[in-house]
Regions:
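Hydrophobic/aromatic-lined pockets within catalytic cores
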Residues: 12-20, 41, 45, 49, ...
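Divalent metal-cofactor coordination and adjacent catalytic microenvironments
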Residues: 31-103, 128-144, 148
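Short, charged/polar micro-motifs that form catalytic or ligand-binding hotspots
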Residues: 1-2, 23-34, 122-134
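An acidic- and aromatic-residue-enriched active-site/binding cleft used to recognize and process polar
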Residues: 17, 25, 36, 55-59, ...
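Short secondary-structure subsegments characteristic of cysteine-rich extracellular domains
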Residues: 25-44, 154-170
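Internal mixed-charge
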Residues: 6-7, 93-180
């Protein structure tokens, strides 16, 4: 069963470093993993339309309308890391873009009903694709490499390897859908 600690230990193993039992233990490696895992995970999540992270919801109108320009405001879901598509639910509107803007954690538009397709901030690694888990572990290893090894050449090499793993994971993920 996958866990954040397992993913961190995969990163530490890549570096030849001591593994951890928990993110809160009082070791340098645990502190680094605890500090860097979530930002790395979210950066990787935002970098691609990962199939395992896509959510679709109808947004509820906010009670307060925008001050100018648009008629309606909607609050983005708490875990929304990236908006992929906004539509009004009719078949042809899914293929055409509606006029809207993202302002902070709000969507403003003139549409009275909207649906959101977005990248969700899923925290359970068991819900990640295996390639995504591996890509995150490699990105984490590259990120913490210098702090653990004090070797900039090795850190640069790991960044190259991590980027290769990320490209591979994106390719595998992108080819799972039917052709448009």
């Amino acid at each position: 069963m996958a866990s954040v600690v397992n993913m961190c230990n995969s990163a530490l193993n890549l570096l030849g470093a001591s593994t951890i039992s928990s993110l809160t233990e009082d070791t340098k490696n645990a502190r680094l993993c605890n500090q860097r895992f979530e930002p790395i995970r979210d950066r990787v999540f935002r970098s691609h339309n990962w199939n395992c992270l896509i959510k679709r919801v109808q947004l509820a109108q906010d009670s307060t309308a925008p001050v100018v320009e648009f008629s309606y405001a909607y609050t983005l879901p708490v875990g929304c890391l990236r908006v992929l598509k906004i539509h009004n639910g009719s078949t042809d509107s899914i293929k055409s873009d509606l006029e809207y803007k993202i302002e902070g954690r709000k969507v403003v538009t003139d549409q009275s009903t909207i649906y959101l397709v977005y990248i969700d901030q899923i925290t359970d690694p068991n819900e990640f694709d295996s390639y995504l888990r591996e890509a995150i572990s490699h990105q984490l290893a590259a990120d913490i490499c210098y702090a653990i090894t004090n070797n900039s050449t090795l850190a640069n090499n790991y960044m190259t390897r991590a980027d290769e793993r990320l490209r591979e994971a994106r390719f595998i993920d992108a080819t799972e859908n039917s052709l448009d």
